[in-house]
């Protein structure tokens, strides 16, 4: 998972990812490169969207797809670390439930409460 390091640019944390290479470097080096260098190295470090907003978007995207595994749990924890409050998570999940589905919201709430 991404590790945060401070940078001087706009005081936003720099995301550094090595999990792709660690898990798949020998088996799928192109995928590992895209995961570590493009998704996290470039996309997550693009400062046009702040990390808090980016975390919210990611949680909503996973929720809307019905992905409730460890990746959603990690992204909920990441959202909390980047300033998304418990009340904001509850309001976001409630709002998205009307568009993505009630059962998906229940699954997210079960993870978010942990």
Regions found by a protein language model. Name each.
Residues 54-62, 92-93:
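Short, structured motif recognition centered on aromatic/hydrophobic residues
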Residues 70-87:
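Mid-chain, well-packed structural core segment of small domains
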């Amino acid at each position: 998972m991404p590790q945060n390091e401070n940078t001087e640019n706009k005081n936003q944390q720099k995301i550094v990812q090595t999990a792709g290479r660690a898990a798949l470097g020998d088996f799928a080096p192109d995928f590992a490169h895209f995961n570590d260098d493009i998704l996290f190295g470039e996309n997550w470090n693009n400062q046009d969207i702040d990390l808090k907003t980016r975390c919210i978007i990611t949680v909503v995207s996973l929720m809307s797809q019905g992905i409730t595994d460890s990746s959603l749990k990690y992204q909920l924890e990441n959202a909390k670390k980047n300033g998304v409050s418990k009340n904001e998570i509850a309001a976001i999940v409630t709002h998205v439930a009307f568009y993505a589905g009630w059962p998906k919201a229940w699954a997210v709430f079960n993870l978010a409460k942990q």
